[in-house]
Amino acid sequence: LAIKIPNVIWNYSADIHTATADWTTQDVIGGIMPKMGDDNEPVYDIQYGCVVNSILKNWSKGEGEKGRVEIDDYKGVWTIIDEFNRADIDKAVGQLFTSLRTKKMKIPTNKVGIPYEDLKIPNDYRIIGTLNTADKHWLFKLSDALKSRFAFIEVDIPSKEQKDEEIYYAMKNAMKELSGHDFDFVSLDEKNKKIAETTLPEFKEMVFDAYNCLDLVRCFKKLGTAILKLIYQNLLVGMKMKQDPRSILDNSLSTNLISQLEGLPQAENQTISASLKGEIINLFKNKIKSPQDNESYVSSFEKILDYIGLEKKKIYVNNFSKGNIQDDQWEKLERLCAEKLTTINTDNFSQVLQDLGN
């Protein structure tokens, strides 16, 4: 999306770079770096960083509008920094703070007596950063000074109303990345953007079970369509190899979801596991008896109520926190869970989730 926006909407090319935890000013602006000379002796030269290299591509000869250059019919070049908050980005781009306002940047040179020179930043130059705030344990925080230089746009996960369309695009991209293979057991309805009715029934069932599992997981951690695509790639390969359908789904979910769920609280992993096995009400009935368990499961209980669309959920959440849900309330919850939650026979995936919760 970050690449397509400049291309499609504004007709700009984009250089994409992935930030890492060891990024410094040299990676963004540049600096003096050693290299081997023609005589195999070490010499020092200027090596520009990703932002400076992108800005330089906008100029053909000198500064000013007459010096602007079009590249492959694009109006200019922007910079995309992927995984923006994987780096200590304030330290790496700190020198840019003033430059982004003044539209001039001081860059190092190898000219005698001139350590720095000014590089003009085009008025239409932009930096786009992509970041994921979910994995807070491994991310750097962004300062207020940095945030004031950027406009923030939240891209949420697809809604459940977009189910068929999300499945369609995830499967289409999964098949595209496995090009060269004939997956004759699945067909796509290009017109209506969904899985075609001619798809092999047992494979179609796996496709929807995988989506329903991810949809449940999204109550506890927002995972995007890229994860669904990876799951579908595993399904396609497993089906092509004529493996047992249940094992294919089980392995696909375990391979792609477990690593995403390792950091979740014990209560949430156990709630996901019990929901997939059709045992969620029994789990909550057991946990409500213990004051300690009761407190740790209130949040998971509320998220499941949201998922099944229970009206007046605050009454149920309040009663659960007090350890006092009536029999008729349990019966209503059991009916709704049976209607809204998909029971999936994934022994390995459910067991690993259970182990994560212990």
Question: What kind of region is each of these model predictions?
Answer:
Residues 1-358:
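C-terminal regulatory/interaction module of P-loop NTP-utilizing enzymes
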